[in-house]
Amino acid sequence: RVTFRQADACALPADLLDFDAVLLANLLCRLPSPAACLGRLDGDRGLVKPGGIVVVVSPYTWMERFTPREVWLGGYQDDEGREHYSEEGLQAALGKNFDLLDKHDMPLLIREHERKYQYIVSQAMVFRRRL
């Protein structure tokens, strides 16, 4: 049995909880607050029930017009020149309550018009919420 729901990823309704699986596809780097979305995945009123799966697919193309730089999960150098990678930021954000099961690249082709296409390689990561 499958239920599909659509809502604002940064302000999800309180009645959304205990799903077996949640898919976050190509939206994380377009949210004004990725932490608000990710923080809603677990806890007493978590979207994902214990033992459930989260699939996050993202190209990590952070842009300040969508997401303030100070809340990016990665994709930048800090003032001391250290690289911060989105993959590591995502794992850190979910790591205390989720185990990484799999990750791989997922190519994507977007047709803008008959003569222009965008080729993008997103990263797909699969996590399981700890019991």
Language model feature labels by segment:
Residues 1-12:
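S-adenosyl-L-methionine
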Residues 18-20:
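Conserved acidic residues
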Residues 23:
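A conserved beta-strand element that flanks and buttresses the S-adenosyl-L-methionine
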Residues 26-30:
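Short catalytic micro-motifs in class I SAM-dependent methyltransferases
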Residues 35-50:
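A short glycine-rich, Lys/Arg-flanked "PGG" loop and its adjoining helix->strand segment in the class I
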Residues 51-59:
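Conserved beta-strand signature within the Rossmann-like core of class I S-adenosyl-L-methionine
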Residues 61-104:
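Conserved Class I S-adenosyl-L-methionine
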Residues 96-99, 103-131:
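Core SAM-dependent methyltransferase catalytic element
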